[in-house]
Amino acid sequence: LSRIMLAIKSVLNDTDNMNVLVFDEIDTGIGGEVGLALGRYMQKLSAKKQVLCVTHLASLAAHAHAHFFISKQELQGRTVTQVHRLRSEARVREVARLLSGTPESSLSWEHAREMIELYSPGKE
């Protein structure tokens, strides 16, 4: 459904009055070259709109202008959501976790750092 909305919003991009686009799990079932192409396209789309994208795909996260980590936990019977902006090493750690499932691998850190350097549109 998110990809259908991406297609519709892309066609209407220059004619609609929506300033914010939100995509939840747009990366479901994709990876590799398609994930990289989606990341490049989302960057292009973000030049004209504010784009918020919930993703679990490292290649899509590496393309972001800004990277946030959202977590939920239960405290005293209530669900509490926290949002943290990730910068520099924290961002590398999270992209490494998305790549390998564990951020402790030096190989995943190296790959994550390379992806961010290659695909991120600029310094945070």
Set out the residue ranges of the language-model regions:
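GG-anchored amphipathic helix commonly corresponding to the ABC/SMC/Rad50 NBD signature/C-loop
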Residues: 1-21, 45
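Short, glycine-/Ser/Thr-/acidic-enriched flexible segments
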Residues: 11, 28, 75
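Conserved D-loop-proximal element of ABC-family nucleotide-binding domains
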Residues: 15-16, 28-36
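Walker B catalytic acidic pair
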Residues: 24-25
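C-terminal lobe/lid and adjacent interdomain/linker elements of RecA-like ASCE P-loop ATPase modules
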Residues: 33-124
